[in-house]
């Protein structure tokens, strides 16, 4: 759903979309043009039946089709998004991650873990999937669905799930903007690669603020995404910070001091890459930390 939403909204420029599923019917109803029914012999297009091992076999059956789709064109980076705990996402996503990494692509996983009411068995299966994903991608973001109940309890179900989708799209859009927008202190794909390659568990998020102390407030918002399961970055090894500034209210030298105060809390061994760029949307100020 998140991928279909991003594709139809056009909110992530410079990104192409590919759907992989064992369920042929689900693919048929998706608006995404590029899709692969994985494991047609293994599953007969009927899904993995909540069995990760069957989905893993399906992905391996379609390994060459997946590899060809990922390496065609000028692709340098792949986001793999999947739900953990069921069959297809849990079993196939790690295989797809390994295919992408073997092709030399920078590979980022963004996965969800289930609600508590979905049961212990599904949660344990999801956690095993997360473990396998950590071994199959360069960097991994984990979105905890249980937090939807805790944080958005007064929202409708569709509104709450939309918040989870936004966490995914913000990460993809943040990277897309960073690579495609020329900055005053410019960052590019090489900086993203340096930060995320073999990075482990990651936080990729965007914070918006305006007015007094907007730098500090934007940093806090970027770090305090309620749905990210691992948003404590005190032990981070790499920081990539890009600040987008409004032409009506350019960044001041004193605001750089606020940024310096934030980075001083980290170990001297942390490698920090910093850039600035003009804001190309309506927000007054954006600070992005990855």
Where are these regions (language model features)?
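Tubulin/FtsZ superfamily GTPase core signature
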Residues: 1-290
């Amino acid at each position: 759903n998140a991928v279909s939403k991003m594709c139809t909204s056009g909110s992530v420029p410079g990104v192409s979309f590919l759907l992989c599923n064992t369920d042929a019917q689900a693919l048929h109803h998706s608006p995404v043009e590029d899709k692969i029914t994985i494991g047609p012999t293994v599953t007969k297009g009927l899904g993995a039946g909540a069995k990760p091992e069957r989905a893993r076999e399906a992905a391996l059956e379609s390994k060459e089709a997946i590899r060809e789709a990922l390496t065609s064109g000028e692709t340098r980076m792949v986001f793999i998004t999947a739900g953990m705990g069921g069959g297809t996402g849990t079993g196939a996503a790690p295989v797809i991650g390994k295919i992408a990494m073997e092709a030399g692509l920078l590979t980022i996983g963004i996965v969800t873990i289930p609600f508590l009411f979905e049961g212990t068995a599904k949660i344990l299966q999801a956690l095993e999937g997360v473990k396998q994903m950590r071994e199959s991608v360069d960097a991994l973001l984990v979105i905890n669905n249980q937090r939807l109940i805790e944080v958005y309890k007064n929202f409708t179900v569709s509104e709450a799930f939309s918040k989870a989708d936004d966490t995914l799209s913000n990460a993809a859009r943040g990277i897309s903007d960073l690579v495609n927008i020329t900055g005053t202190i410019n960052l590019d794909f090489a900086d993203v690669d340096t930060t995320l390659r073999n990075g482990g568990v990651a936080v990729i998020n965007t914070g918006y603020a305006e007015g007094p102390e907007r730098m500090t407030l934007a940093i806090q918002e970027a770090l305090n995404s309620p749905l990210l399961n691992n948003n404590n970055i005190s032990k981070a090894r790499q920081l990539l910070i890009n600040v987008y500034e409004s032409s009506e209210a350019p960044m001041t030298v004193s605001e750089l001091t606020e940024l310096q105060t934030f980075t001083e809390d980290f170990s001297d061994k942390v490698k920090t890459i910093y850039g600035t760029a003009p804001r190309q949307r309506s927000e007054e100020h954006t600070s992005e930390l990855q």
